[in-house]
A protein has these predicted regions:
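N-terminal entry module detector
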Residues: 53, 65-66, 78, 82-87
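Short C-terminal domain-edge/linker segments immediately following a structured domain
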Residues: 40-44, 64-67, 96-99
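Short, conserved secondary-structure transition motifs
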Residues: 68-81, 96-102
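Acidic, His- and aromatic-enriched active-site or binding-groove loops in soluble protein domains
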Residues: 83-111
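Positively charged, Gly/Ser-enriched RNA/tRNA-binding surfaces
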Residues: 1-62, 107-176
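Amphipathic alpha-helical segments within well-ordered protein domains
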Residues: 53, 75-79, 92, 107
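Short, surface-exposed recognition loops or helix-turn segments adjacent to catalytic cores
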Residues: 63-73, 91, 172-176
Length: 176
């Protein structure tokens, strides 16, 4: 009773929220899940992104943004900015609010949580600079220097380059 490796699963179905729905969020909704287990290389990441972009393209969506992230890059950015390793979880919880409260709100909440204003400013400035530099992994790797393991930036570059080379519809890739 062993699963093949890699194991791939696709399911589409109704799901329900356990929590109380908020404005614009429904208790029941349809969701698509694609899972790949047991693939240690970047191929799983590439395949998942391509499945998503191909599907969106066939549904007629164009000019959308695929947002990818890598926790080790966020950690390197936090270390570069002066946050202590034991504070990363708190910093990332606040950072996750970026879409709701904006960069200024994130910066303010970091400071309100007791973090140095200089660290908060430096951290948020990195995101602005990254956007200004076209979400370039090479730029970020150079900027972060020894704070970022070379393997991390190489893997992310491989994923982005592979997806861009085979893209099935018009879309942008952004580090988020």
């Amino acid at each position: 009773n062993e699963l093949p490796s890699p194991f791939k699963a696709l399911q589409i179905g109704n799901v329900w929220r356990a929590d109380r729905p908020q404005r614009g969020r429904y208790r029941q909704f349809m969701q698509c899940d694609i899972d790949i287990l047991g693939e240690p290389s970047n191929l799983a990441e590439i395949e998942l992104i391509l499945a998503t972009t191909t599907t969106l393209g066939k549904l007629g969506f164009q000019d959308f943004v695929i947002r990818i992230n890598e926790r080790r890059i966020l950690k390197a950015m936090a270390a570069y900015s002066g946050f202590a390793e034991e504070d990363y979880d708190t910093v990332f919880i606040i950072l996750d609010k970026m879409d709701k409260i904006g960069a200024d709100g994130v910066k303010a909440e970091l400071v309100e949580s007791g973090f140095a204003a200089e660290a908060a400013d430096k951290y948020m400035a990195l995101f602005d600079e990254l956007t200004a530099n076209g979400n370039s992994v090479a730029w970020l790797a150079e900027k972060l220097g020894d704070f970022l393991e070379p393997e991390v930036s190489q893997n992310l570059s491989e994923i982005i380059d592979s997806v861009r080379a085979t893209k099935a519809s018009e879309f942008e890739i952004a580090f988020d």
